[in-house]
């Protein structure tokens, strides 16, 4: 029997009462404020998004606080805070003498999708206090609440540790890759290593057809930017198709070949993919295709160099536009990278491919472990916070089972 079972059996063997959210918590609307009327500081301003709208030098909530985003695409998004914050286009919820704020947060988090569903308004959706104030919350004794919070905190901490480890490993890999590909040379170059533009080291730089291609039930796979994964691969598992005749009519520079580099240039720009197999496919205009000059640069080396921090900084500078950032083919052709001899490139490829393999294992293993932990956390959260209603009393699943056993024993 777990500690939680013991507490339930001792403190609430006959069930748990439930009450409306507004009756057991302190719910307050935010205070209107604009950035231009504030001074910059270190206090997060909570508004309609998932991240602070900006930072100011004053606060209107302190201690444990739950916030619910008030408007926009993120309306209804729940967050838990333990630092001073300024609640603006949002509302806050705090616990009282009979309910712990963190317990309340976990219970409401379990209802996140329902809270999203209460959005009202056409152009700019809103979630108001009135949207959820009548939600009924099981209120077990405080020791039971605290034990539930302790268990769920442990699961959340395990997930956070795994996520932090994955982030640290990625940064470590990026550091070594950047160090290997810096060469300690200036942009003007040395005898051994020169900085060259992509236009200089590529036979062609093109993008996909700017006209929507004809679709078919079978034929040649047509990939979009959503088929480019964060692991720098092309995912062919969910693609549309175009007729073979359409593919055959394309210019040769738009037909991917082994050794070509794909590079996303619109929206989620800056993701390179090295084509390692002779696979026929076509792609949308949001993706560029670069054909390296093999006598100057090895495609695998070019692929690694296009992932460095220095190259990404060039991409950020070249990306233009408000709604969707776009890197033009001209700007792409002028972006530079260090090009040593082919012999040096080969040695670097061996090292970087080894790093890549390690990171790929991490990118598969750790995210899978993180996902498993999240599912485990959600399972226990649902189990711990799911209560079966019976008249004016809420019983836990365990209590319902015990009650059924007692009734069976009497028969």
What are these model-derived regions, one by one?
Residues 1-411:
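Charged, alpha-helix-forming regions
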